């Protein structure tokens, strides 16, 4: 993957996480904070958090697992089948905001 494509996908991933966190935050007791840098994206809700790097995702309650943004716009998490970025972002936001 080219660095330019990676940057575009990384920015899109952060945007999707922000959008779904905001949407789910409307019905949640707490709102999410999304912190973005070239090295990581962190989604925080109270004491719970998710942290994405270009190669892994970890959470406040689980061990680190493999993570990858793929060239076709899908997300690969650990050994699971790849899924569309928007579907994965919605699921992560929902699970963090509405446990």
Show which residues each predicted segment covers.
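Intrinsically disordered, low-complexity regulatory segments enriched in Ser/Thr/Pro
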Residues: 45-87
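Alpha-helix capping and helix-coil boundary motifs
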Residues: 1, 5, 28-29, 83-84
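Extended, compositionally biased alpha-helical segments that mediate assembly or anchoring
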Residues: 75-77, 88-99
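Amphipathic, interaction-prone secondary-structure segments
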Residues: 19, 24-62
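Conserved short hydrophobic interaction patches
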Residues: 12, 16-23, 95, 99
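Charge-rich, low-complexity N-terminal segments
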Residues: 1-17
């Amino acid at each position: 993957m080219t660095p330019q494509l990676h940057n575009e996908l990384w920015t899109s991933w952060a945007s999707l996480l922000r959008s779904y966190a905001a949407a789910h935050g409307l019905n949640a007791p707490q709102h999410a904070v999304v912190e973005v840098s070239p090295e990581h994206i962190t989604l925080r809700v109270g004491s719970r958090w998710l942290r994405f790097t270009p190669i892994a995702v970890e959470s406040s309650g689980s061990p680190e697992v493999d993570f990858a943004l793929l060239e076709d716009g899908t997300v690969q998490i650990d050994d699971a089948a790849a899924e569309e970025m928007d579907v994965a972002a919605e699921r992560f936001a929902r699970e963090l905001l509405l446990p």
